[in-house]
Amino acid sequence: MVLSVKQTLSPKIGLFRRNPSSSLGRSPVSLSFPSTELPKRTVLAVSKPLHLSSSLRAKSPVVRCEAYEADRSEPHPIGDDAAAAETKSEAAKKLKIGIYFATWWALNVVFNIYNKKVLNAYPYPWLTSTLSLAAGSLMMLISWAVGIVETPKTDFDFWKTLFPVAVAHTIGHVAATVSMSKVAVSFTHIIKSGEPAFSVLVSRFILGETFPTSVYLSLIPIIGGCALSALTELNFNMIGFMGAMISNLAFVFRNIFSKKGMKGKSVSGMNYYACLSMLSLLILTPFAIAVEGPQMWVDGWQTALATVGPQFVWWVVAQSVFYHLYNQVSYMSLDQISPLTFSVGNTMKRISVIVSSIIIFRTPVQPVNALGAAIAILGTFLYSQAKL
């Protein structure tokens, strides 16, 4: 684009020095002057291709300068046009992020509702977790096959680096599902809001990282709020509580492995999560068979169909599909926004899940329990602010 346009006493343009009287014969390929004489005292310094045109009006020649991007055929906006274009671009970006967030929250709420319905009728969290990963893997394989999504270019090193991430993701996913099979959805998410505390502790004592005092102070309301909610939970279950805690720890390691191993990898957020789901599915399937087994699944399936009816099949399909979709959108959102904005969005997502699950499942909540949840979520928000 144009770097400078200024007036001097020398009739030269860019690197071309010309005599006005001899300029009528021919012109450089990149310049066009319809008028009979090039206006004097003009210097243009450029770093990209220019198109210049001169037109004579009533008394004096007017030089019109348009800058073109090298790979575009339209003039690059200048001045007020550039400001208007930038404002329009910012508005479009904010709208796109808003749509991402709204979709992310909505999909997550729907998943948690159907997931809890399935687990209430069919208490086999290992199979439920496996079906969630299988549905997402199948959806992405079809998307790659028909060309809806570009197939990622991966190699052995990519999958080797992804393996520890997939192990941590598998453990976190199964542990969270086990937790939801034993306790209320709201309680699981209240405990999972304590994930930042695990992140700081692991980073401090295992990785040797240090944090500002404000980060450590933000852990006080997180830990205190989670503890208050756990102590006042009406339907407390130790397996459910420990499942949520293990999920927190596993997802912390997943994030650490992902940050360390995936630097410089040119894979989009959507494809990255697809590869993660496929590898996690391969890891989880043999363990699910060993822990629960086909015989238990068949017996439980028949019981669920007899109790709930044919709509139970829809519940299973919905929870599996929506699990992949909400995670996929979250990874796509992370491609577009800063980690701070993502953390705030994740906090708001957890609030929407807790509130909606309490309303839909009519979960009894004591005032002290609600206070603990609010304190824990506030601490999570303060942590996201202090961390960055």
UniProtKB/Swiss-Prot annotation:
Keyword Transmembrane helix listed: yes
Function: Glucose 6-phosphate (Glc6P) transporter. Also transports inorganic phosphate, 3-phosphoglycerate, triose phosphates and, to a leser extent, phosphoenolpyruvate. Responsible for the transport of Glc6P into plastids of heterotrophic tissues where it can be used as a carbon source for starch biosynthesis, as substrate for fatty acid biosynthesis or as substrate for NADPH generation via the oxidative pentose phosphate pathway (OPPP). Required for pollen maturation and embryo sac development. Preferentially exchanges Glc6P for ribulose-5-phosphate (Ru5P) in reconstituted yeast proteoliposomes.
Key words, A-Z: Chloroplast, Endoplasmic reticulum, Membrane, Peroxisome, Plastid, Sugar transport, Transit peptide, Transmembrane, Transmembrane helix, Transport
Knockout-associated phenotype: Gametophytic lethal phenotype in homozygous plants.
Family membership: Belongs to the TPT transporter family. GPT (TC 2.A.7.9) subfamily.
InterPro entries: Sugar_P_trans_dom, Tpt_PEP_transl, TPT_transporter
Source organism (scientific name): Arabidopsis thaliana (Mouse-ear cress)
Impact after mutating S27 to A/D: No effect on targeting to endoplasmic reticulum
EamA domain boundaries: 112-229
PANTHER family in the cross-refs: SOLUTE CARRIER FAMILY 35 (PTHR11132)
The name this protein goes by in its record: Glucose-6-phosphate/phosphate translocator 1, chloroplastic
Tissues of expression: Expressed in seeds, flowers, rosette leaves, and roots, with highest levels found in stamens. Found in the root cap, in guard cells and in mesophyll cells.
Listed transmembrane segments: 95-115, 129-149, 158-178, 211-231, 233-253, 273-293, 305-325, 363-383
Signal peptide, first to last residue: none
Segments forming a coiled coil: none
GO biological process, one term: triose phosphate transmembrane transport
Bilayer topology annotation: Multi-pass membrane protein
GO MF annotations in UniProt: glucose-6-phosphate transmembrane transporter activity; phosphate transmembrane transporter activity; phosphoglycerate transmembrane transporter activity; protein domain specific binding; triose-phosphate transmembrane transporter activity
